[in-house]
C-alpha cells in the first residue's frame, strides 16, 4: 500500500469517526455504532502506526513495503 493510499484511508476513517462521535454527542448512538466507533479508533491506530513505520524505514534507507500492520494490543499501548 502506498503512503497516499494509507493517508486516504485514514482521512475516510477520521470522517467516519467524527460522524459517529456526533451521533454519540446527540444521544442517538446505538450499541452497534459504539462498537463501530471502537473498531474505527483501533483501525486508525493501526493505520497511523503503519504510516510511521513506512516513514521510518524510508528514512533509514530500507524498503517501506516491508512495514506491516501490528496488532491492536501493540499499537494501543504506545505513548504518543
Regions found by a protein language model. Give the residues of each.
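Extended, charge-rich alpha-helical interface modules
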Residues: 1-80
